[in-house]
Amino acid sequence: LMDSIPMVVITGQVPTTLIGTDAFQECDTVGITRSCTKHNWLVSDINDLAAVLHEAFHVARSGRPGPVVVDIPKDIQFASGTYVSPEHAPRRHKRTVRPVDRSRINEALELMARAKRPIFYTGGGVINAGPGASEALRELARATDFPVTSTLMGLGAFPASEPQWLGMLGMHGSWEANHAMHDCDVMICVGARFDDRVTGRLDAFSPHSTKIHIDIDPSSINKNVRVDVPIIGDVAYVLEEMLRVWKSKTMQVDKAALKAWWKQIDQWRAKKSLTYKPNADVIMPQYALQRLQEHIKGRDHYITTDVGQHQMWAAQFLDFEEPNRWLTSGGLGTMGYGVPAAVGVQVAHPKALTVCVSGDASFLMNMQEMTTAVQFRLPIKVMILNNKYMGMVRQWQQLLHGNRMSESYNESMPDFVKLADAFGATGIRCDKPGKLDDAIALMIKTPGPVIFDCVVATLANCFPMIPSGKAHNEMILGADITDAEVENAIGEEGKALV
């Protein structure tokens, strides 16, 4: 639900005659899933089944996408009934398409034309709105020459190779993206929801900006941050309409102010906030992903990740030129997502290179899905950044608990090469920077599923970072930071916000 995944889950239930009797394996599936789905159904009449299934797929995909559950008792599964086609099925959940307020679009465009320090803040809603939304965003950004940043879920909506791209924003975003967000005077939020990983301290979030918010979900408007110009509607349609009006009115930006704004942004870029200390003896995780980027550049490829430090480093060091090439759990942040996601991607795109960037702990959450990859001959490549820790947990224990480690060190990790062999896949291991390129090349060219155990520095921290409870302009960088500075980065109030 938090990742906006349109998923239809069909579950089994005890026969209708036993519901409510605490029968063997009875479970109140509808009650349990009510809080984490868009809607759910318990089918009690076989003649309702077809209509319910049609409606389930409609609800999952309409508006802001999300999961739904259809619970089917055992006697209903064995029964025969009348099939109803989607066109003739009664629909209880009729989506009300409210007309987009054109006056709001005009108001937004006037603000953009007068802006001195504008920025596009984009999110996963641009991806979910389809390729047309990403294309419209690109055209509108090029027409205005405004800088563009994105949330974790929105990567790929705007090309990373474009000079207007500032990188990801938020807790582990770039220096230039976060400072531009803090200092902007007009913010155009497109398909994002102002979540806590992006905003930092709310009362200090972009304090001097006029905020435009475009979103299909009315409940996202003014939920976390008060906006000045709300535009409720399909992101693709709204962006296309904004672009049409901008061109038809031959609207112009304040070029002098925009030139000064880009000069300031270039000064922030000069910080090179993703810089890290290289190591000739140990593979730094950032270096591993930089090398992966060089090997996959120009290929038809998809990246999935699990959740943790490796996820943030992948977002920082891998470049995405197109939408839907990056699949990660950035809303709920659930470990174990990467491998099954890679399996799904490979089924959908059998000829593409599919790489799952994982961590040693995350991989173990759903490693059984390697059997699926082997069984169906899906050549997914799982690149494990193995630091022998739950890295993000360890980093927070250093930040919040005086470096007192608890349950975050994985002393009894399996031999991932032998584990790959046990699954019937290919295992590769590398722990030397000088051999890393050969190992990545071997991973890519090896037929079938591969587990690549990339042994990286154990205590590397993920920077840059906005400490919890701090504002965008209070970021800390990682290149020269001391352990003492890390441990004192978060105050007492911020500790409760992690």
For the regions a language model picked out, list residue spans one by one.
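Active-site diphosphate/adenylate-binding microenvironment
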Residues: 263-340, 345
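Generic enzyme active-site microenvironment
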Residues: 69, 213, 304, 357-358
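Thiamine diphosphate
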Residues: 10, 18-25, 134, 178, ...
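Glycine-rich, N-terminal phosphate-binding loop of Rossmann-like dinucleotide-binding domains
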Residues: 122, 190-191, 307, 358, ...
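N-terminal alpha/beta PP-like core and its mobile active-site loop of ThDP/TPP-dependent enzymes
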Residues: 1-253, 282, 291, 379-384, ...
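Gly/Ser/Thr-rich loops at beta-strand to alpha-helix junctions
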Residues: 124-128, 309-310, 362
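Short, surface-exposed connector motifs at secondary-structure boundaries
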Residues: 39, 113-120, 295-298, 323, ...
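Structural motif
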Residues: 186, 302, 353-355
